Amino acid sequence: MIQIVKKNDEIVKYLQKDRRINLNALSYLAYNGDADVHIYDGNIENGVIVGSLRKNFFYLATHNRDFLDEFWESLPVGHKVFSGVPKSIADIMTADREPVWYSPCKVFVHNGVHIAEPNQDFAIERLTAADADEVNEFYTYKSDGSINRIRESIEKMDSACIRIDGRLATWCLVHMEDGSLGPLYTKAEFRGKGLAEAVAVNLMKQLAAKNMPIHVQIADDNAASLSLIKKLGGMDFSHDCAWFGLDKL
């Protein structure tokens, strides 16, 4: 039987046993204190599932197939998004369920030792609410609801951008769902100047100053970002994960 509880010390302690693997779930709980936490048969050692039906994001931290199956059956009809799921768990969840979409990613976590020095050639500032529409227009995963998430991220989370001749040239945000870095984008006409590296390093330093974890999930086919991550300093590969969507009929 599944019980739904709220964040507590026992849940955080369990997730911290494998902090890197569970960092997105830990960060989600840090940024969303009212999130639902699902436990199975009253035993935290069966793992946990963290998420929100309202936001339609779920983080799976269990290999227990019975738990995963019962959780799936408990969900209402509709499209469900699973975020940053470790590959071994994603394989279980999708074994008998065909994803509508599936994006394999690599997770990088900062080792706390070193961040590259920021490029001083550019004036870096925060994004404003007025930038939301433009950021959304260039968002790789643009959807009907993405503008609302981007606007909320800009308003509530840290960000960094560079403007050239008054035009937005490059930007990087922090995801409001789990505190991970992204989206990061540089317009085509401004590429090759080191702008993306400059805003990413600036944003990492903002997070470090607040003692917030620095982590990012990069799609396997995003060669540019996989190359950039090596230049930022201290970003170590952690594990393979996946974002995917399932339709509950």
Labelled PLM ranges:
Residues 87-99, 220-238:
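Conserved active-site alpha-helix within GNAT-family acetyltransferase domains
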Residues 12-75, 164, 169-183, 187-188:
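Conserved donor-binding loop and adjoining core beta-sheet/short helix segment
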Residues 187, 191, 219:
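Residue-level recognition of the GNAT/N-acetyltransferase active site
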Residues 66-74, 192-208, 226-227, 231:
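Conserved acetyl-CoA-binding loop-helix of GNAT-fold acetyltransferases
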Residues 46-120, 243-245:
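Acyl-donor-binding surface of acyltransferase catalytic domains
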Residues 76-86, 207-219:
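Conserved GNAT acetyl-CoA-binding A-motif
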Residues 132-186:
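A mid-sequence, solvent-exposed acidic-amphipathic segment
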Residues 1-23, 112-145:
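Short amphipathic alpha-helix that is part of the acyltransferase structural core
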